[in-house]
């Protein structure tokens, strides 16, 4: 089988994902995202067999179709950033799920904030 990905690396990827920020209603990455995304680049450089799936999610505010496009665009922005730092595009995939996979209640601002997110999943195969 493939070597197991360490808990520490999984934690670093999850911290990075939680620190990805965009302009409101936009797929433009904010500069404060860069440090943690650079950590993802470092992990991928250290582990050439690892791949990353990048998933974008939105809250339920606004039209479903716009949220779907926004979630896809945001995931693609993260992918583009990683490629710009030298990660081979073949190791990255991105997808958007719009508002279809909430992790919190969309009725509250705090819940909506949790639902607006990027998730990154490492694989080693």
Regions found by a protein language model. Give the residues of each.
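Periplasmic OmpA-like peptidoglycan-binding domain that tethers envelope proteins to the cell wall
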Residues: 27-34, 53-125
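Periplasmic peptidoglycan-binding/tethering modules of Gram-negative envelope proteins
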Residues: 1-51, 125
